[in-house]
């Protein structure tokens, strides 16, 4: 393919796409430049479908290269290791809008790789990668019902900004990413500072206008350099077999579905499956996989039919009904804060831990070095769904759910000045039947309040679903697992009473329009307020006192010029304070100092030691010091941490002293008076001028 270059203007910057320049052996490849950010995106597909699977094997990789920001990787090996959390979240951003646009039943392996080659701080590389993935797939022979476009949206001073720069992102009230086709929205992800539903909807639709321009641009590229799509050969089920299975199994599946409890429902469906397979195994011994597929289709149709025609869900709820909720706080006696949040058969335990500011997480990737003072981790063990599988650390889904819950609470976390602690939340999914990420949001709010963290407002979350059959649109509140699995949308919305703090929307159909979005956001608002009311019945506000097991923080402000003295040569002074008191000390460049102690007594002792260092030594003042070492000409005495002076042998006593050891020894606590401080800061001390005459006489 000959090299071709295509350009368009997008939100005040040039978007440049080069085709045929690099990676020509891939099915599709695009070199995309926006500002000074450059991303290479490739798409490859296997020639044959993978046998024996019932899912689409799509993998998306987002490769961060540190040379893109002029850095050399740390560590001994000096090369990039496993993907960062940011890279995993970016890969999910690319994956989610393109996945529903492949043909249903397509089983060829498809791999999309986005390699970040150069990063402009004002241009988010994940947005460039999302556009590049659409280009690479659209020009290739891989079946793909695109193209899609993607933009970021900020809100600064009441104005929407497309693809905001670094400074604008810092000021923005929302961080929104939207992807869509020419006709509809496909994916939404957002973090926001209590933004009203109307504003969020306006932002999404504003983004769609720019997405249309990107799609039109990519369609032009496809016309010029695109190749014909390969034929998709889908497995067809024998019509006679399908009719027989439907006639035999439809009513049985319908009855099995009408069960409120997930486990009982699954057991009933398993029994029907076994009964059907047993019934047809002699007539169709080689078509058992086809029978399973027909049963799946019947189950999906019947579940959706209940909703669209009967307006009732498999567990008996109406479309807007929320499952029963119960909450409990303070469930773990030795933790700093804990809560269990249960909604139906979804149950999450969230634990809050408070630490010193030195416990912050430092993120050093292709962006600016970032310090995270608040973090949320999400664990999804196999027992939560009654399964057995190896425990191998968090997967992409767990990292994504943890990040969503973290984003939902971030706007209400108090500032470092208000609450000088590092905060870690861990959500343990104890039982799962849909919407565990939003249960984690609710559990996190309760755990923070139980820990005494002065959050600005409580946050709750709810997952919305969609069943769309022709013109009949049914939006579901608080979806359970089967409705997520067999439905058309998973739309998670978290927020406070005032507005939205986080959104994540994924769909399985080609797209949804403004009216569906508007309906879903309004129903989510009502659901969120109901859930908040249930949570506040358990704990109305953050506790006034921290847990007795939580660390105590003492704040000080010192003269920045004194920081060097507090630290001491090679960190000797501060290390001594920490060793003697058992505290943690964090010092900011502007003189803010935080002492984190397990108890107030040790914290106060460390504070006194620091005050002694920062207090200026004055001539004529008397101090209680400790003898550090002895020389033939005198004794060196520490009068404050890191500050010592010399008591000359002639200043030890009013009487003549033959040997220093005759008067003092190492480790003695003695009173001394400052007699002089020279230009170099050396301190001269006198013992004989500090003691009353009678005490001197008594000693001698």
From Swiss-Prot:
Among Pfam families, the record links this protein to:
KH_1, PNPase, RNase_PH, RNase_PH_C, S1
Stated role:
Involved in mRNA degradation. Catalyzes the phosphorolysis of single-stranded polyribonucleotides processively in the 3'- to 5'-direction.
Family the entry assigns: Belongs to the polyribonucleotide nucleotidyltransferase family.
What cofactor does its activity depend on? Mg(2+)
Reaction equations catalysed: RNA(n+1) + phosphate = RNA(n) + a ribonucleoside 5'-diphosphate
Intrachain disulfide bonds: none
Q: Keywords of this protein's UniProt record, alphabetized?
A: Cytoplasm, Magnesium, Metal-binding, Nucleotidyltransferase, RNA-binding, Transferase
Q: Which organism is it from?
A: Thermoanaerobacter sp. (strain X514)
Please give the HAMAP family that the UniProt record associates with this protein: PNPase (MF_01595)
Q: Which GO terms describe its biological process?
A: mRNA catabolic process; RNA processing
Q: What are the boundaries of the signal sequence? A: none
**Gene (name only):** pnp
For the KH domain, which residue ranges apply?
A: 551-610
Tell me which residues make up the S1 motif domain. Answer: 620-688
Tell me if Transport is a UniProt keyword of this record. no
Q: What is this protein called in UniProt?
A: Polyribonucleotide nucleotidyltransferase
One GO MF annotation is: 3'-5'-RNA exonuclease activity
| Keyword Nucleotide-binding set for record | no
EC no. given is 2.7.7.8
Q: What subcellular locations does the record give?
A: Cytoplasm
Q: Where does Mg(2+) bind?
A: 484, 490
InterPro entries found in the cross-reference section:
ExoRNase_PH_dom1, ExoRNase_PH_dom2, ExoRNase_PH_dom2_sf, KH_dom, KH_dom_type_1, KH_dom_type_1_sf, NA-bd_OB-fold, PNPase
């Amino acid at each position: 393919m000959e090299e071709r270059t295509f350009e368009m203007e997008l939100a005040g910057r040039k978007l440049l796409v080069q085709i045929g320049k690099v990676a020509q052996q891939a099915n599709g490849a695009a070199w995309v430049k926006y500002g000074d950010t450059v991303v290479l995106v490739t798409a490859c597909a296997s020639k044959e479908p993978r046998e024996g699977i019932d899912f689409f094997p799509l993998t998306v990789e987002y490769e961060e290269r540190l040379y893109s920001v002029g850095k050399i990787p740390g560590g001994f090996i000096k090369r990039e290791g496993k993907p960062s959390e940011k890279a995993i979240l970016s890969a999910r951003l690319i994956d989610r809008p393109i996945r529903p646009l492949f043909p249903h039943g397509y089983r060829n392996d498809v791999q999309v790789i986005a390699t970040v080659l150069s990063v402009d701080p004002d241009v988010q590389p994940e947005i460039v990668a999302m556009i590049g993935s659409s280009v690479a797939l659209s020009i290739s022979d891989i079946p793909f019902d695109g193209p899609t476009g993607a933009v970021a949206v900020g809100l600064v001073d009441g104005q929407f900004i497309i693809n905001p720069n670094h400074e604008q992102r810092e000021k923005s009230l929302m961080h929104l990413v939207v992807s869509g086709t020419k006709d509809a929205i496909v994916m939404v992800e957002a973090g926001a500072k209590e933004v009203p539903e109307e504003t969020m909807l306006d932002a999404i639709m504003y983004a769609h206008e720019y997405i249309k321009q990107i799609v039109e641009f990519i369609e032009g590229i496809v016309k010029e350099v695109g190749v014909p799509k390969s034929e998709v050969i889908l497995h067809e089920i024998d019509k006679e077999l399908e009719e027989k299975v439907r006639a035999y199994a439809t009513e049985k599946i319908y009855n099995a579905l009408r069960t409120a409890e997930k486990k009982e429902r699954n057991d009933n469906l398993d029994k029907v499956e076994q009964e059907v397979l047993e019934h047809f195994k002699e007539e169709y011994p080689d078509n058992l996989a086809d029978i399973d597929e027909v049963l799946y289709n019947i189950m999906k149709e019947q579940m959706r039919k209940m909703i669209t025609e009967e307006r009732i869900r498999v567990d008996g709820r109406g479309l807007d009904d929320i499952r029963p909720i119960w909450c409990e706080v303070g469930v773990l006696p030795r933790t700093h804060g804990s809560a269990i949040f249960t909604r139906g058969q979804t149950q999450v335990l969230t634990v809050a831990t408070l630490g010193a500011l030195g416990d912050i997480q430092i993120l050093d990737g292709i962006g600016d070095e970032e310090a995270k003072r608040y973090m949320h981790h999400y664990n999804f063990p196999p027992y939560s769904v009654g399964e057995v599988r190896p425990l191998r650390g968090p997967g992409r889904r767990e990292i994504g759910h943890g990040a969503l819950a973290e984003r939902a609470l971030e706007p209400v976390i108090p500032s470092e000045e208000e609450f000088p602690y590092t905060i870690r939340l861990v959500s343990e999914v104890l039982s799962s039947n849909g919407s565990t990420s939003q249960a984690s949001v609710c559990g996190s709010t309760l755990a923070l309040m139980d820990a005494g963290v002065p959050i600005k407002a409580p946050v709750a979350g709810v997952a919305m679903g969609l069943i769309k059959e022709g013109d009949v649109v049914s939006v579901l509140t608080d979806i359970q697992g089967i409705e997520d699995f067999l439905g058309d949308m998973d739309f998670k919305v978290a927020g406070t009473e005032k507005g939205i703090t986080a959104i994540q929307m994924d769909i399985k159909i080609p797209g949804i329009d403004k009216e569906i979005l508007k309906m879903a956001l309004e129903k989510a608002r009502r659901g969120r307020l109901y859930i908040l009311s249930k949570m506040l019945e358990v704990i109305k506000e953050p506790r006034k006192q921290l847990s007795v097991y939580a660390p105590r923080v003492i704040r000080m402000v010192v003269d920045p010029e004194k920081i060097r003295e507090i630290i001491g040569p090679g960190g000797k002074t501060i290390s001594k304070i920490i060793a003697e008191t058992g505290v943690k000390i964090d010092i900011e460049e502007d003189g803010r100092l935080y002492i984190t102690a397990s108890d107030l007594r040790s914290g106060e002792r460390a504070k006194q030691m620091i005050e002694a260092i920062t207090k200026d030594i004055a001539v004529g003042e008397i101090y209680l010091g400790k003898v550090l070492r002895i020389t033939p000409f005198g004794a060196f005495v520490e009068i404050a941490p890191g500050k010592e002076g010399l008591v000359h042998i002639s200043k030890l006593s009013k009487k003549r002293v033959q040997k220093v050891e005759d008067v003092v020894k190492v480790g003695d606590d003695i009173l001394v008076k400052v007699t002089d401080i020279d230009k170099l800061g050396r301190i001269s001390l006198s013992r004989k001028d500090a003691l009353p005459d009678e005490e001197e006489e008594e000693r001698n």
